[in-house]
Amino acid sequence: MNIQQALNHITKNIHLTQPQMEEIMRSIMQGEATEAQIGALMMGLRMKGESIDEMTAAARVMREFAIKIDVSDIKHLVDIVGTGGDGQNLFNVSTASSFVIAAAGATIAKHGNRGVSSKSGSSDLLEQAGIHLDLDMQQTERCIREMGVGFLFAPNHHKAMKYAAGPRRELGIRSIFNLLGPLTNPAGVKRFVIGVFSDELCRPIAEVMKQLGAEHVMVVHSKDGLDEISLAAPTTIAELKDGEITEWTLNPEDVGIESQTLNGLVVADATASLKLIKDALSKNKSDIGEKAANMIALNAGAGIYVAGITKTYAQAVAFAQDIIYGGQALEKMSVLAEFTKTLKQSQAD
């Protein structure tokens, strides 16, 4: 099936099969599809609604084309990642949570990009923190193995995605490519916390991850519209564990955290995001820092739990709070910045 035939199917509201979608995705990754065709595909799938088979097939092909890092032998290897597109411009919760999860004894291989629809993507924030992302594959692997936390800058690993970059930028809508980012970690990760931009995606994304061989996954979307676990509202969760998917709703009070509004947690840019995160992870916090710390604990707890460090989510949230208030997460951030600086200097010598 060529992309024109696929578009014809999609306009009739017909889902593509996995083999059909794999063929279309390969044509995009090999530079055979025009930008107009890619843009039309993005819009058509968005209007129709991406099926589980379409997402699974596209993710499988994208993984096939990825430049990989093999750290799959590491125990407790996890990624915490969001689709973006919640439009609320909160501080970068998942990136802050990464340092807490790593300080808890899990290993983070975080797959991220610059902000597409938000003001602070993970890469924007990390660069502000002095963490170098322009590392080669061996250096990134060293960060993961030696520091317990490494960041996989998506364009370095998914070079074939350059063909979709123009349409994504020009259309400015969330699309199947926003969904694929969290599904295509190039480090062989099988444990994930994935935030999605609609609660209707929670179960389907869990189903996709099951087909892709994941072991333990929490797919989350909060009732106030966040692609993460919210401090201000219940969060819908689809959890894949031991091959089974269960759906449940989480209230912060369920794990001993008082619900609060998100006032004060919105940031203008990566600089403001970093300032708030450093406040939240420090031992002496402002009132807004305390609130941000609670938000981080809810999300870091999910990562600690799916990584297999604790048996329950509630235990993991309590552990995350201990780490945040003990200052270990902030220390992990500064140590990683220093380590990447050393790697870059040795590269230059």
From Swiss-Prot:
Gene Ontology terms: biological process: L-tryptophan biosynthetic process
Molecular functions per Gene Ontology: anthranilate phosphoribosyltransferase activity; magnesium ion binding
Keywords: Amino-acid biosynthesis, Aromatic amino acid biosynthesis, Glycosyltransferase, Magnesium, Metal-binding, Transferase, Tryptophan biosynthesis
Residues holding anthranilate 2: 168
EC number: 2.4.2.18
Presence of keyword Manganese: no
Residues engaged in binding 5-phospho-alpha-D-ribose 1-diphosphate: 82, 85-86, 92-95, 110-118, 122
Residues bound to Mg(2+) 2: 227-228
Protein task: Catalyzes the transfer of the phosphoribosyl group of 5-phosphorylribose-1-pyrophosphate (PRPP) to anthranilate to yield N-(5'-phosphoribosyl)-anthranilate (PRA).
Family named by the database record: Belongs to the anthranilate phosphoribosyltransferase family.
Subunit structure as annotated in this protein's UniProt entry: Homodimer.
Full protein name: Anthranilate phosphoribosyltransferase
Organism for this UniProt entry: Acinetobacter baumannii (strain ATCC 17978 / DSM 105126 / CIP 53.77 / LMG 1025 / NCDC KC755 / 5377)
Gene that produces this protein: trpD
